Amino acid sequence: MNVTVLTKPDCVQCDFTKTHFDKHGIEYDVVDITVDADARQKAIDLGYFSAPVVIVEADGQVAHWSGFKPDRIKALGAEAGEQQ
């Protein structure tokens, strides 16, 4: 499973999202959309205009959402635990 969190500086929901991923032992990459134009465009192409945007690639499928979603992060943590 590959997880990418598109973030921006001074983003409380971004910080909560990263903290929750850490809490559930999920590894993720962080990309700052204020300095990476391609990442910013990817978020826009997915239909999002606010951070964080989380992109999860697993088993050939891609899931994504915007905002702090602790229930989805917890479910990913449980799923990752099953795969180990």
Please place each PLM-identified region on the residue numbering.
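Short polar/charged helix/loop
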Residues: 23, 38-42
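Non-catalytic, surface beta->alpha helical segment in thiol-disulfide oxidoreductase systems
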Residues: 58-83
